[in-house]
Amino acid sequence: MTIKSDKWIRRMAESHKMIEPFAPDQVRVSEDGRKIVSYGTSSYGYDIRCADEFKIFTNINSTIVDPKNFDEKSFVDFKGDVCIIPPNSFALARTVEYFRIPRSVLTVCLGKSTYARCGIIVNVTPFEPEWEGHVTLEFSNTTPLPAKIYANEGVAQVLFFESDEICETSYADRGGKYQGQHGVTLPRT
């Protein structure tokens, strides 16, 4: 597998709608002139943005966290430009961008150092061949203080790897449970 360059990412986004909406260059300043956490195309990746829809984890129901039977009431829904994550807690969000991954491609997503250096960890699983949808993002606040996440700014970088051989079975072929997801998607079994 080889990592794909900015030229390939631009070509695939423009001709195959691999990323929508798409920023062909790095964006570091907002439309009103403010400095922001960068997003858009980088040398060998694409920096994704967080939308303004969040699910903030709370344990008001004193429930047990069970990935096979997750209680949706464990979250508080929030919509806004800045999400405050409680100390030692987490929040879910989704990307602004909608992805359509080619059959020969697998992605790996890594959190941006701007957040990591503040104790905020971004976790995303790989985007599998022929998966499509908005990406659900998980932000862990590892600090003993509240932490901010900024909507419509960069939060993580997606790296695209192309195989020299097409996979036998893609995510779409398997009927993956997160195929075509919109909005923040909770665990499914």
From Swiss-Prot:
Keywords: Hydrolase, Nucleotide metabolism, Nucleotide-binding. Signal peptide: none annotated. It catalyses: dCTP + H2O + H(+) = dUTP + NH4(+). Its EC number is 3.5.4.13. It is an enzyme of class 3 (hydrolase). CDD domains: trimeric_dUTPase. It comes from the Bacteria. DCTP binds at K112, S113, T114, Y115, A116, R117, T136, L137, E138, Q157, Y171, Q181. Pfam families: DCD (PF22769). Coiled coil: none annotated. GO terms for molecular function: dCTP deaminase activity; nucleotide binding. Pathway: Pyrimidine metabolism; dUMP biosynthesis; dUMP from dCTP (dUTP route): step 1/2. The active site is at E138. One of its GO terms (biological process) is dUTP biosynthetic process. Belongs to the dCTP deaminase family. Catalyzes the deamination of dCTP to dUTP. Homotrimer. HAMAP family: dCTP_deaminase. This is dCTP deaminase. It comes from Paraburkholderia xenovorans (strain LB400). The gene is dcd.
